[in-house]
């Protein structure tokens, strides 16, 4: 795993900020997306759904970024999962409120095929900022939110989960 700068440079960003007449951006206009995953420790479905997508995205020349304030990725899990250790970047110990900004900057750079961020509940403004950043950076952004398991028994919808032991 490597550490990478989160400089907000994006090849297409300059063309969008100049005073010239609007020009076509190189990345497709439908590119990039943000999805939110609310998961529980009792359901391993997210791992089964998310892992094949991460494996596919790891074939790109870009990085996979994990913004994980509390989890630590395991090298052995990365190997077993078929994810390239040399393309995975992990930033830990980030204040959850700063994680939204870090995720936005990372998506904008275009250096990452996917950015996974463990975030608190997003505001609508946060969602809009992240969607735009993902579109401009032609990247996937996955907002990961653990569900408090005590809510499941009180009528909450079933949710998806990623086992936390995979990250230790």
From Swiss-Prot:
Keywords: Cell cycle, Cell division, DNA damage, Septation, SOS response. The record marks 168 as: Essential for degradation by Lon protease. Induction: By DNA damage, as part of the SOS response. Residues 161-168 are annotated as: Lon protease binding. Residues 106-112 are annotated as: FtsZ binding. Is rapidly cleaved and degraded by the Lon protease once DNA damage is repaired. InterPro entries: Cell_div_suppressor_SulA, P-loop_NTPase, SulA_CellDiv_inhibitor, SulA_enterobact. It holds the Pfam family SulA. GO terms for biological process: division septum assembly; DNA repair; negative regulation of cell division; SOS response. Belongs to the SulA family. NCBIfam families: PRK10595.1, SOS_SulA_coli. Component of the SOS system and an inhibitor of cell division. Accumulation of SulA causes rapid cessation of cell division and the appearance of long, non-septate filaments. In the presence of GTP, binds a polymerization-competent form of FtsZ in a 1:1 ratio, thus inhibiting FtsZ polymerization and therefore preventing it from participating in the assembly of the Z ring. This mechanism prevents the premature segregation of damaged DNA to daughter cells during cell division. HAMAP family: SulA. Interacts with FtsZ. This is Cell division inhibitor SulA. The lineage of its organism: Bacteria, Pseudomonadati, Pseudomonadota, Gammaproteobacteria, Enterobacterales. The gene is sulA.
